[in-house]
Amino acid sequence: LLSAFLVIIGTLKAQNPIITDQFTADPTAKVFEGKMYVYPSHDIPSPIERLKEWFCMADYHVFSSDNLVDWTDHGVILSQENVPWVAPDSYSMWAPECVYKNGKYYFYFPSTPKGEGKRGFSIGVAIADKPYGPFTPQATPIEGVNGIDPCVLIDKDGQAYIYWSGRGMSVAKLKDNMLELASEPIQIQGLPEGFKEGPFAFERNGKYYFTFPWVKEKTEVLAYAMGD
């Protein structure tokens, strides 16, 4: 079980933004093939009225650097119009994740599915041979995963776990193909009450850390939990 510890990050002033020609959020940063790759969400001016004052995200770019100063935009790596299960008027490709396993790169992303009676968010997977793509999306989202903000932890024994937010925080094992659940989702216990999102899990020195934004007394802070 995770025991919750909380930390509040003080106010910081952003300096030297690495992306200046487009609106981005929710970055996940990974070292692949000797370079740093940053996978953010991408906000655009809304083409539809209902999203004029909300997030409007239709695709993903990836950026890479070998010195953390000079960055290359590899362009669009995935667009909602190329994902078979995503609603064409969704514009909800929010916080993504990318991991490497079995010689492939797996890109996890949330969006809203098309189809009568479909509600809420699902999480899909796209696969590539290189960290900058091209990524090929699966025809359907991961069955049993309903939420946003995917995070995938590959443990030291090779077992992969997927975490996500939506009606609390959940986790499940992934099959070796990285495309299907190998266990039933469970709710992560021991976390503080209140709205939580954006989970990120990692291991260091034999301890597992689970970080997440948390709304505490109407202010969003960064919190973390630890487990064995």
Q: What are these model-derived regions, one by one?
A:
Residues 1-15:
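Bacterial Sec-dependent N-terminal signal peptides
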Residues 14-228:
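Carbohydrate-active catalytic/glycan-binding domains of CAZyme proteins
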